[in-house]
Amino acid sequence: MKFPIRAKTAIALAISGTLATGASLASAQVLEEVIVTAQKREQSLMDVPISIATMSGERFTSLFEGGADVRALSTRVPGLYIESSNGRVAPRFYIRGLGNSDFDLAASQPVSVIMDEVVKENVVLKSFPIFDIDRVEVLRGPQGSLFGRNTTAGIVKFESFKPTEEFTGRAKLDVGDYGTVNFEGAVGGGITDNLQGRVAVLTQNRDDWIDNDYTGESDALGEIEEKAIKGFLAWQPTDNIDVLFGAHYRDLEGTSSLFRANVLTTGDNDLNENYDRETVYFDEGDGNPQEYDNDGYNLKVGWDIGAYTLTSITAYENANGYSFGDIDGGFGAVFLPEMGPGFIPFPSATQDDADVEQFTQELRINNNDAERLFWQAGVFYFDADLDVKTDPGFTDPTTVSHSNESWAVFGQGDYYLTDQWTLTAGIRWTYDDKELDAPAGQSTDIDDDQVSGNLSLAYNMSDNSMVWGKIASGFRGPSIQGRDVAFGGVSSVADSETINSIEFGYKAEFLDNRARLNAAVYYYEVDDIQFSVVGGDGNSVTVINADSSNAAGMELDLQFLVNEYVDLTFGYAYVDTEIDDSNLEVATCGSRLCTPTDPTRLGLDQFGQPILFANIDGNPFPQAPETTLSFTASFRYPVSRGEIFAFTDWAMQGDTNIFLYETKEYKTEDQFEGGLRAGYRQTSGDYDWEVAAFVRNITDEENIQGGVDFNNNTAFDNEPRIWGGSVSVEF
């Protein structure tokens, strides 16, 4: 017995071909089937009535050659966007425009990240380095039945390579610009007749390369030192029991996000003369250091008892560290002898220390060898604690403690009505409880329980095409935001948000299995949607509920194996998001240097100070790109005992509003980046080896990724152009 169970009805069709590996495909002159675990069992994508994109192979590994982190996946999957204002530690995920732009380490997210079947709830845990990955699956839309709360937008699933009986190994070394040196290696195989193991390591290093012109220091910031290791042991004590134990560890030291003061001119969203990628002007922040470590352990046990299989997944995660940064992005202030670049109302530097613990337990049962009905049911328990100590510099540090406990019961079934029609239905009940403990008796306790589910109908039009329709619901648990306590304010609370969505999809394979198309259209409404009001006039971090919101969009994935030498992919996503709350207002930029385009009014804050409010009814969601485009081309030509190859990838991000309110400055338009790698690989003999040259951000685009609006027109940018070479071996 092997787990997870593979569906007997799997059709040799793969969808989301945009993101499949190319090298192995050319040799067969057809596109290989893609297997996913989107429904907690192995299935062909053709059997799954969900909009799913997958990524693996060269398409995946090429993104990380310049020392990139998980944000490199952003816009490379249609409908997926990732950004961070906290360096490599706290990525924020968005799917179909839905996410959370709150930078606070306690903020909940509507996109769930799952690594090797273990949910990573906190943003620090979501940042574990991505290496030795078999595939990535992006599940778009609510996944409330099988995965529960906080999946209203979707899920990003990472599946590591697992141990096999065959002895295998691989190693890859990248050397590039700015002193970039990356190494990734893995080895595994059979240890005894019923025990297998695999261990993988990663190191990513980059030198300081950014000058601090205020202090006169050259190469003062930008360093990366990241080390990670993970391993698995697979054990089969009997013929009907499988055990898989995993452990991982990560150690990070380096530079956090760099905020650049007044690089946006009032009335314009183009970078101005204050911006120089290789220069900052910091008088605080001590070089914006960031240090974190993370360890985790998980145990999966599968027991085949004949007609049924019982599965248990137990996991523990722990992480701690700190980030310190110059938030105003410049030096001095208007009331000090000097300031710059541009207008600095007041200095701001903050350090956050975090200690994260998480425990999860899942028990489920499913039937085996079902002729017409496959079902699974289970229970899930989640318990997490987070302590955040914030030092704003002008008052004593404050520690705020968060705890979150959740229970769930779930079930889902696939009923094969005929050879062509399949009905899928799922339901889940969830209880979610959150507590906050803060100084001066500012304690808060909130809880909620919800029922979510899905119903879909799939029709196989032929052996190579299908259509489906799906309705689904989900919810994000209530939220507590306690960051303002550290700045003399009070905590805020938001009720649970609930989503209802409908989507229709089409999947097809044609041209003798050399082309694949995956398309979906959808519409969703979110009641009591949670938004984070970050910064602005008054410099607060508050969670709020809007009455309602909605979005409509589409996704398209296409892959075409032109011939044995050329493989092309294309991805496209469009989403139109809208906030629907006629009375909802938020504070605009604190510096008054930005240009709001929303209706505004002058009011008073909690301290009686004048503040400019904007009505955000009808606005798009923050950090929700209206369009994303991606394109790749792979070329291979056999020579001698191997082949020469070239691979290029490009992505474009359309109009994106950074904050809840709209301005002329804090929005991005038609940003794009591309990469290229070319070389020679030998694929005959006892082992394969490869040598290549690569370039990331080949045109050296200077793109805004986000902003800080409470002080001045501050922004942070993308990664620089990185060029280099790599050598790898695999056996």
Explain the meaning of each model-derived region.
Residues R92, D104, E253-L264, D383-D387, ...:
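Surface-exposed extracellular loop regions of Gram-negative outer-membrane beta-barrel proteins
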Residues P91, S108-P110, N122, F131-R140, ...:
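Outer-membrane beta-barrel translocator/receptor signature
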Residues K2, R6-A7, A12, A28, ...:
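Conserved C-terminal beta-signal and adjacent last beta-strands/turns
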Residues T164-E166, D174-G179, G185-D286, A319-F346, ...:
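Periplasmic-side early beta-strands and strand-to-turn transitions of outer-membrane beta-barrels
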Residues W375-Q376, L423, Y523-E525, N545-L660:
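Gram-negative outer-membrane beta-barrel transporters
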Residues A234-T238, I365-N368, F380-F382, H402-E525:
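Structural signature of Gram-negative outer-membrane beta-barrels, strongest in the C-terminal barrel
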Residues Q29-E166, F504:
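Acidic, small-polar-rich N-terminal luminal/periplasmic segments of exported/outer-membrane proteins
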Residues N298-I327, N460, M466-A472, D495-N583, ...:
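Membrane-embedded beta-barrel scaffold of Gram-negative outer-membrane proteins
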